[in-house]
Amino acid sequence: MAAVTFASAITNAITNKTTSTGMVQFGSFPPMPLRSTTVTTVATPVGQPKLYTVRFGSLDPVIVKGGAGSLAKATRQQPSVEIDVSLSEAAALEVAKPKSSAVLRMHEEANKERALFLDWEASLKRRSYGIAENEKVVMTTRGVSKIVPRSSRAMKQKRARERRRAQQPIILKWEPKLSGFSIGGGFSASAIEAEEVRTKWPLHKTPSMKKRMVHKTCKMSDQGVDMLIRSLVKIFKAKSANIEYIGKKPIKVDFIRKERTKFARIQVAHLLGKRAQRDLLAGMEENHFIDILSEYSGNGTTINPGVVCAGWSGIVVRNETLTQKRSRSPSKAFVIRGEHEDKLYDARIKITKTMSLKIVHFSARGANFWKGFDRCFLAYRSDNREHTCYSGLDVTECGEVAALMCLAMFPCGKITCPDCVIDSELSQGQASGPSMKHRLTQLRDVIKSSYPRFKHAVQILDRYEQSLSSANENYQDFAEIQSISDGVEKAAFPHVNKLNAILIKGATATGEEFSQATKHLLEIARYLKNRTENIEKGSLKSFRNKVSQKAHINPTLMCDNQLDKNGNFIWGERGYHAKRFFSNYFEIIDPKKGYTQYETRVVPNGSRKLAIGKLIVPTNFEVLREQMRGEPVEPYPVTVECVSKSQGDFVHACCCVTTESGDPVLSEIKMPTKHHLVIGNSGDPKYIDLPEIEENKMYIAKEGYCYINIFLAMLVNVKESQAKEFTKVVRDKLVSELGKWPTLLDVATACYFLKVFYPDVANAELPRMLVDHKTKIIHVVDSYGSLSTGYHVLKTNTVEQLIKFTRCNLESSLKHYRVGGTEWENAHGADNIDNPQWCIKRLVKGVYRPKQLKEDMLANPFLPLYALLSPGVILAFYNSGSLEHLMNHYISADSNVAVLLVVLKSLAKKVSTSQSVLAQLQIIERSLPELIEAKANINGPDDAATRACNRFMGMLLHMAEPNYELANGGYTFLRDHSISILEKKLSADLGRGMERVKLVGALCYKILPVKASNLYTERFANAKRSRFRRQIQRVGHILLRVEQTASKRSER
């Protein structure tokens, strides 16, 4: 019960009057003034208690009992009386239990007063310069206070808390409590009220009378928990075991030795490779645990500056043991994180983002590296060793070699650098192919020279280097294998073809493809074991090769995704990369200058007229019909040159088109169009808009490069993502190999090369191709058509059909036709070019005619090599000055040809020192390897002259070996006889050439004085004629000698 102190006028008589009350105090609450109330005083004996009615504010009156008569007497004598209801006082005031409605009204009044006080408090606290309810004050990273708005989520939570607080009832300390005493052995008042309130539910069930056993919960105080933690830490430290504290934030602890003392180490974020502003998340409970942990971490010895270094990350120490400058710590312990500007930082405090990147962490990275190295090395090393391992190599050298091997396999600046990993994935930068090969060679040499005992490391690097050098650049053999194996469907030739396609890929081939290559090789081995040959024959009389009237279906041109709304083909990125074709192998037509200069398409041994002039269309129908007539060429019948055979059967796709009667189909006039690519050789042609390189520009292929239209047609079927690589391969690799006017065989080989890397081009349609058997040229018709008519039509329609020309067993003259031609071959014939005797005669004619020899060498730079047949021709070639004249020309024109001529000059000097023809021939034979090497450096098209020179040099090389054996055995008589016959014949040819020169000189020597004397006698006397003639002859003789000397000096 609360103590009540009040002052009132109390009388001992029965009176009813209004009196003014004083102050009333409840317990320790401040006194409260009382309003005027009616006090009823009853006269009672001194021993009887007195009743008082007290009213507080608007509350119901409360009846208060007073003490006995002695107390009343005292109160009458004192104006103010203090009554305490405790039992220790003389009198007790007992407040009777009010009704329940009164209690509710008391609660309502209290809530109203509390709300009023809260409003007053809020109004008094509100300042015009303060913050709003939806704002808060935060501290920035630089230590500056800043007002920021609260989030909508935070405001929602705040309003929810206020609602819950308002709904809670207010329990006053003076609220009456129900008595727990029973009256007459019955239930107490509190039990009766609780029984009235409780609802028996459900009504239809009988409650169980079984008493439930409730076990007492085992509880431990905070002090007991701390004692338990200390005991566990002490045990784990002794055993060096790991601890994991599970709270709001888990903490993992282990024990390590530093400075001969065992410390506790916490796993912080940067030990896991993470850089965060707060390295360790810890609350109050975690900090308390860390404080306990610090008592058992170390031995309390002072840690001087410089002791804490790499490897101390996460170690827990006491604050007072550190003497170095340090940051603040949220508790008594200090968790070491790192150092920044000579200041240690605790892992639990939050630092700025910039500092988190600059701080030097004290993690032992090397230890972590070797920890992972040892773990994986021991886990994955092989167990099938037949010996017992022991330490026989120097550990330091092992580490150095391991570092070199790591750099060879994984070139990097740091093994933990993610950018170096990206370079290795993309094979770029320091991990590019050439860079790795160069670096690999350097490191291998270092291991060989500095670590001779590590031979196995050198072997591993050798194998690795071999795997990197996996680019297959043997294009010539690839083409020859393709020509031999493609199209032969019998025996092992299909397997040879597929094996060739896999080998050309090199390192880009997958393991599955290599497995397939082994299977193909097995089939080839079986074929070689059981070899069979079948001969089939075909008759030209029964040859029919009709062209299909149905157009070839090209899926690329039918795909809606590659067509615009008008149905035209969309080049996309292919059009952009097609610039590599148009800028290098096409020239721009200027319509302002007219089309006349482009009407005649000149080839080395002929010409063909284009229909480009027909782009100007007249409006007169008669003139227009007259314009649609072509200019026929001389017709050519169906011969063996028109067909291609494979094992006796006709390969119709590689033949000329015929009618049903067997006559050749002659080409008609092909009308021109602008800005189009025309493809399709069967049925109606297809017109594809050229890519928009430059607006309203017309392009025509340069002379010798009309076959570029084939690659441009293949580009239609190439994926956009591969267009760049496709055009680069064509420009840099294939066109440099093909050159001008290549053969159809070379063009077909180039198409197969592209098919290997870009399979989608196999069904690409080709432009129209016309065959001119007279000039042995195949014309690739572009969008400007052909005014010349009467050519044969080649049936080849797709790239796959064109590749059939590469088959080695294909008997065809067409594959040797030029897509154009060469001047040397067309002027002199392939048979003469392939004959060494004809070539050396041609060289002999040019020995004393340097201008003619220079023109011949422009077409055939290998012509001087035929002088190797005769030592006399080499000496004449050297003594005449023609060799020196050609050297001076080719030093600036072609250095590779100049090198060949220098080798010939040195050979001529060696030959001149020997008198015997046989000895001279032996000198020539010993110089053959040098000449062959010099010839290999000369770049030129694979024409008839080049192939003839290759065969000639191969013949000399193969003759030199048995001749050397015969000479050592003494069998030289027959050879001497044949050489002498050849030398006499060639010497006669050289002599006739020299006689011509002498005859011209003699004529000049005789005619000059006669003409001069005649001119002199016309003006002067006859007596002086003979004397003047002698003087003129002498002057002419002197001049001729001076000119010869000057010419020799200039040649030198």
Curated annotation (Swiss-Prot):
InterPro entries: HC-pro, HC_PRO_CPD_dom, HC_PRO_CPD_sf, Pept_S30_P1_potyvir, Potyvirid-P3
GO biological-process terms attached to the record: proteolysis; symbiont-mediated suppression of host innate immune response; transport of virus in host, cell to cell; viral translational frameshifting
Residue stretches making up the Peptidase S30 domain: 219-362
Motif Involved in interaction with stylet and aphid transmission location, chain numbering: 414-417
EC number from the UniProt entry: 3.4.21.-, 3.4.22.45
Superkingdom of this protein's organism: Viruses
Gene Ontology MF terms: cysteine-type endopeptidase activity; serine-type peptidase activity
Active-site residues, Swiss-Prot/TrEMBL: 270 (for p1 proteinase activity), 279 (for p1 proteinase activity), 313 (for p1 proteinase activity), 706 (for helper component proteinase activity), 779 (for helper component proteinase activity)
Motif (Involved in virions binding and aphid transmission): 672-674
Residues annotated as domain Peptidase C6: 698-820
GO cellular component: host cell plasmodesma
Secretion signal, residue range per the UniProt entry: none
Modifications the protein undergoes after translation, according to the UniProt entry: Potyviral RNA is expressed as two polyproteins which undergo post-translational proteolytic processing. Genome polyprotein is processed by NIa-pro, P1 and HC-pro proteinases resulting in the production of at least ten individual proteins. P3N-PIPO is cleaved by P1 and HC-pro proteinases resulting in the production of three individual proteins. The P1 proteinase and the HC-pro cleave only their respective C-termini autocatalytically.
Entry keywords, A to Z: Host cell junction, Host-virus interaction, Hydrolase, Inhibition of host innate immune response by virus, Protease, Serine protease, Suppressor of RNA silencing, Transport, Viral immunoevasion, Viral movement protein
Keyword Glycoprotein applies: no
Residues of the site described as Cleavage: 362-363, 820-821
Stated family: Belongs to the potyviridae P3N-PIPO polyprotein family.
Notes concerning its domains: The N-terminus of helper component proteinase is involved in interaction with stylets. The central part is involved in interaction with virions and the C-terminus is involved in cell-to cell movement of the virus.
Protein name (database record): P3N-PIPO polyprotein
Taxonomic lineage of the native organism: Viruses, Riboviria, Orthornavirae, Pisuviricota, Stelpaviricetes
